[in-house]
Amino acid sequence: MDIPQELKEQIEKISSIQHKKIIEESQVISKKYRENDGKGKRLVEKESEAIAYAISRMPATYCAVYSVLAQSLKKYDQDIKTVLDIGAGTGAATLAVTNLIDTEKVICVGREMEMRKVGKQLMENNLPNVEWKSFDLNKDEIPEKADLVITSYVINELTKEDRQKAIEKMWDATNGMLVVIEPGTPEGFRHILEARKILLEKKANIIAPCSHNGKCPINPEKDWCSFYTRVARTKIQKQAKKGELGYEDEKFSYIVFSKTPINQSDAVILRHPQIGSGHVKVKLCTQNGIEERTYSKKDKELYKRVRKLDAGDTL
């Protein structure tokens, strides 16, 4: 997946000043985010660090959010006119949302002033009416409710106690849909399971990726549920990450909740289908647990359909 051309141009524009320094900062920022998960520390304090964050993380975050929303909107038929992006960073999630949904009002809230400043710069041409507000998820009350509340790569920065409070707070601010996205790691999946447990107790309805509201059949001590999107790298990303490949794979775990009941699917594909000679094998999460099924040419249209599906798709 490629990010929108206008975002690519804006990132290149803001990174054109002090080019070498920005590349160095992007490497520092990546290290900070890897090593400070769950410690609640401020990770971005300078404008150059915020720009470096936009270079190193925005394309992948945009693509992950876009993938999650595209999948979730297939099952959700309520109107979404207002959006609240919590821990918005430099606005990647908001850009993904507005490329999929015709919104009337979008509010981006975040703790780091420099991140908000860079986010405004990136959106000044295409989304000038987005509101940006200072907000600390641990300390502040959420400013207002929205039809869609989204938080991406945020709760992994909180302690366990703060995560529970944050999840409950975000659910209270949700009129319709709540999206929570985390890194596609064992730890990220455990955070998703925490959110799942907390909100099912509050009678939330799962839109995606789960096919049911029952107990998750995956043992987090042995495995984890994650998906990925292939992200086209920009020229400056290649320089910042010292990579030659024209792409990177962004792995993510997620869960999406609805205030209203959802027509859930029978099964969700957990891994990319294994296509063999005349057959295809798929690993599925169903209401009865994890299943592995094989479809052959004898299954005709179903066989043809499954061959075209990917992890996260419903069956």
Where are these regions (language model features)?
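Conserved beta-strand signature within the Rossmann-like core of class I S-adenosyl-L-methionine
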Residues: 175-184
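Conserved SAM-binding loop of SAM-dependent methyltransferases across substrates and taxa
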Residues: 90-102
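Conserved SAM/SAH-binding beta-strand->alpha-helix loop
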Residues: 112
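Class I SAM-dependent methyltransferase Rossmann-like catalytic core
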Residues: 41, 45-67
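C-terminal lobe and adjacent flexible extensions of AdoMet/dcAdoMet transferase-like proteins
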Residues: 239-315
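A short SAM/SAH-binding and catalytic strip from SAM-dependent methyltransferases
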Residues: 147-161
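N-terminal auxiliary segments of SAM/dcSAM-dependent transferases
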Residues: 1-40
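Conserved class I S-adenosyl-L-methionine
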Residues: 79-89
